[in-house]
Amino acid sequence: MPRKRRKISLTDKSTDIPYPRVRVEWIDCISDSSWATDKEFDKMKLATPVHEGWLYSKDKKSIKLFASYDKDEDGITFGDRTMIPTPWVKKVTKLS
């Protein structure tokens, strides 16, 4: 039997899930398969993405986040999941 989905009201400020909202600033690798001069290669920089969502877990190896969820009587289903190696994380800020 398919699960019924509920919409979560954007005006509902309740904290009905036991996960903190966070903003994670991190570094990521980039790659480019095109030809480049040494000057162009020297200008190459790492990507600096920012992710906002709920902190699912964090340990020495990785940080796990999710940006959407569905909660009903059967529990929580997580969506938009991201797993980042902990050494790549530069800053974690708790959001209110």
Model-derived segments and their meaning:
Residues 2-96:
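Conserved RNA-binding domains used in RNP assembly and mRNA/RNA metabolism
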